Structure formats: structure tokens, C-alpha cells
Regions:
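Polar low-complexity intrinsically disordered regions enriched in Ser/Thr and small residues
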Residues: 19, 100-103, 273, 284, ...
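A generic signature of intrinsically disordered, low-complexity regions enriched in glycine/proline
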Residues: 27-28, 109, 271
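Switch/communication elements of ASCE P-loop NTPase nucleotide-binding domains
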Residues: 116-298, 303
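Intrinsically disordered regions, especially transient/low-confidence alpha-helical propensity segments
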Residues: 5, 15, 83-85, 125, ...
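P-loop NTPase switch/coupling surface
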Residues: 1-79, 140, 237-243, 247-254, ...
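Extended helical coiled-coil dimerization/tether regions that scaffold
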Residues: 44-164, 298-310
């Protein structure tokens, strides 16, 4: 753990013992099992006392790091399939979950709990489902007088249980939910938010990230394979809805058992200055081949028509 001026190290020794060193010290201040780090970014009280004034600095630094880590929300690439109905325990969950399994609980709380800010989440989710053109409205319905509720999707005048609609909606629902549920100022890490979505909906995800980032001071870290999402992000920069400094993009190159991240350099028009080779395949080559084949096929058809007429 370090600042610009100081560096603190806890090095593991034999039999589970740790030694504590500051800056470029070659000899440890002390070593022993009682100096084992806590949660990898802080040291126990014995080590803090041992370091004296440096201990207070390390304690403040560790606390700052832990607070930053607590502001990170992670959602994995495969979200849990929805149930046909859910029991609501009249409380608000503390998290969406790494597989999105609490997303529906969040929506139930948003729809059913009283409060000026409660409906914000379900309204935000519904708005983006409409913009993605995958639904007209999302609704929570009570089953009789029970504590069980179902999530209903309205589309083209038809309503259906969430479990009965396309899997793309159930996969993107936790993504939309966490965008509004995470506390303002959070960092949201998403893997493949575009999974099972059609191209337009994938593109709209870029708009979601841009708008929610500004509205709620959210930083999104997104791992994606979607060219549609990437292209729309470029367009948003060209439209001046974002600046090139608002959206950093990286290309991950795998070499053997290791991987390297290469920053993509974008200008003010969203154009990439340093395209990696075959980043999106040979798009220009595909277009050229399609055009050549279309011309050749058109000539063949005209020749065939001429022979028939003769």
C-alpha cells in the first residue's frame, strides 16, 4: 500500500509469518504471524502501533481504499433466470447480487414501498426497456391477497410473465436495475451486458451508460464483445454527448497465458486512431467482397434474361 511519498509492505515469510517494512527498508520493523494483513489492504492493530506515526498514515490510507472498494458493484456475464413469481418480505435488499438474483426484489421494493424516491428505480428500468424497443412497460402484480408477486412485461398490447418473454429482457433487467440501485458515486463493473439482446438494444446500452453516468455520477467499467455498443459510444462522442476523455476504451490482447490491455486513442469525433489488426474482423474486406459478388450476380442475371429474350 502506498502514497506518492510513502510505501508500506507486508511480506509473507516462512510458516505464515509476515514482516513489515516501510519505503526501501531492507530490514523489517518486526515479523511474526500476528502481523498478517487484514483484507489485503490493512494491517492489524499490533502492526499499526509498531509503525508509530507511519501507522496512523497507513490506517487512514487503508480506510480510504476500503471505502473505495465498498463503492464497487459487480454484475457478472450470466444473470440468473427469472422465477414465475416472487415473495416480497416488505424490505429493500442491500444488493443486486453478482448474478442479479436480487434484481427483482429491488424492483418489488421500488414498486411497492412508499417514499418519494422509491419509484425511481422501476421507472428508470421501464424507460430503458422502451428505448431498447423490447417492451412497452414493466409492471408488478400481486397474486390475489398473497405475499407473492409476478413481474409482467407489456409489449404491443400483450402482457406476459417475465419468465415467458425472450431471455434478452431477463438478462438485461439486472443491468438496468443496478444502474439505478447502486448508490450515487459508485463504480459499476459489468461483464457482457449485451448478452442475448438484438443490435438496437445493444446500441442503446451505450446511451444508458452515458446518461446514468452523468445523472448519478456513476463510473461504468464494461467488458463487452458488442460492436454495436462500441459504435454507438463512438457516435455519442461525435454528437458531443460525451467527450473522448469521458469514455476510455481498451482492447485486450491475449498472448499465450497472459493478456495485455491496449488503450484505444479516440479523437473528438469518436474515431479510433490506432485500430488493432482485425479488431472487428475484416469489415472493409467483407464489404468489398459483397459488392463484387453483387455486381457479378447482376451481370449473370442480365445475361440470362438476354438469352431468354433472344
Amino acid at each position: 500500500v502506498s502514497t506518492e511519498a510513502r510505501r508500506f509492505r507486508a511480506r509473507r515469510r516462512e510458516r505464515g509469518a509476515y514482516s513489515v517494512m516501510v519505503d526501501d527498508e531492507t530490514q523489517p520493523r518486526e515479523k511474526g504471524r500476528h502481523l498478517s494483513p487484514e483484507r489485503s489492504v490493512s494491517l492489524p492493530a499490533e502492526a499499526i502501533t509498531l509503525l508509530g506515526q507511519d501507522g496512523s498514515l497507513l490506517q487512514d490510507l487503508s480506510l480510504s481504499i476500503r471505502r473505495e472498494l465498498e463503492n464497487i458493484v459487480y454484475l457478472g456475464p450470466l444473470r440468473r433466470k427469472p422465477e414465475r413469481d416472487y415473495v416480497w418480505n416488505k424490505s429493500k435488499p442491500g444488493e443486486v447480487g453478482s448474478d442479479g438474483h436480487r434484481a427483482i426484489d429491488v424492483l418489488l421494493a421500488s414498486a411497492l414501498m412508499k417514499g418519494d424516491d422509491q419509484n425511481r428505480i422501476i421507472e428508470g428500468v421501464s424507460k430503458w426497456l422502451v428505448r431498447m424497443k423490447v417492451a412497452d412497460r414493466l409492471e408488478v402484480k400481486q397474486l390475489g391477497r398473497s405475499t407473492r408477486y409476478e413481474v409482467v412485461i407489456h409489449s404491443d398490447g400483450i402482457e406476459a410473465n417475465l419468465r415467458d418473454v425472450g431471455i434478452g429482457i431477463s438478462q438485461v433487467l439486472p443491468v438496468l436495475t443496478v444502474a439505478y440501485f447502486a448508490p450515487a458515486g459508485s463504480t459499476i463493473m459489468l461483464e457482457e451486458p449485451e448478452i442475448h439482446l438484438h443490435p438496437l438494444a445493444q446500441s442503446v446500452l451505450a446511451e444508458l451508460f452515458a446518461e446514468v453516468s452523468k445523472e448519478r455520477n456513476i463510473q461504468f467499467i464494461v467488458e463487452t464483445h458488442s460492436e454495436h455498443l462500441f459504435r454507438r459510444m463512438q457516435t455519442l462522442i461525435a454528437r458531443q454527448h460525451l467527450t473522448s476523455s469521458d469514455a476510455a476504451m481498451y482492447f485486450v490482447e491475449k498472448k499465450g497465458r497472459s493478456a495485455r490491455m491496449h488503450p484505444l486513442e479516440l479523437d473528438d469525433f469518436g474515431r479510433v486512431k490506432n485500430w488493432p489488426q482485425d479488431f472487428f474482423g475484416d469489415a472493409l474486406g467483407e464489404t468489398r467482397e459483397q459488392a463484387a459478388l453483387a455486381i457479378r450476380r447482376a451481370k449473370e442475371l442480365r445475361a440470362k434474361d438476354g438469352n431468354v429474350s433472344g
